[in-house]
């Protein structure tokens, strides 16, 4: 049997020069123009993570709103451009920028770095699938989101509706193949609650995941993957109602939103410290 040969894009790090004055193109899916855009910057957690990293650490950039992942060098969004050169993957981009613009994690102890890495793994490889489940697999999540984004899939021209249906079917299959869609919704809700309750414990009474005085790259990850659970209740009401009872993670979402996303509104009342 012949195996499919998948293309592999190598990031051309050697072809870009970035310094403090460089304006980097940040290509991402944005929330679009709708009621939810006042509460979240994007429904893509990797995009929110990268944009938050850029804002937290003052990296000059201009946002480019992409409509399809096909334009990404690995067919994934987000990616960055410096001139015509493209670098992909939020994690690889952050790693590279740390080497050329300074590393906001340099002061962390090995144990803190290890903890940050494990939290990142849980969010990007576990909680992410729950996000996809609500965006694509669940009828209620899909109906809610497509209503907000395009005013309901049934109002669209037939060919666009068909393209959306195909995309949804593709992501539903991925959710089933990965395994998340083999759990009941009650089990999925429980999994999401446990991930975020664990982060709440780890933040404790600090301002950020790993300290009180300044954020690290891990805070951009936490914000990217948990913001919508706090801000967009109608996608997943049971999860949102639970996470809004978490005092430390809720305070964290409020801190990051007010400090780095002054244009956004908070959809919930954070607990007072
Ligand atoms: N590891 C990548 C993941 C990016 C990713 O999965 N992006 C999603 C949007 S949230 C995407 O482009 N999906 C399109 C697809 O998989 O077809 C990163 O950190 O940038």
Annotate each predicted stretch with a short phrase.
Residues 2-162, 230:
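GST-like domain detector, emphasizing the conserved glutathione-binding G-site
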Residues 44, 87, 106-113, 182-189, ...:
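Generic detection of long, well-ordered alpha-helical segments
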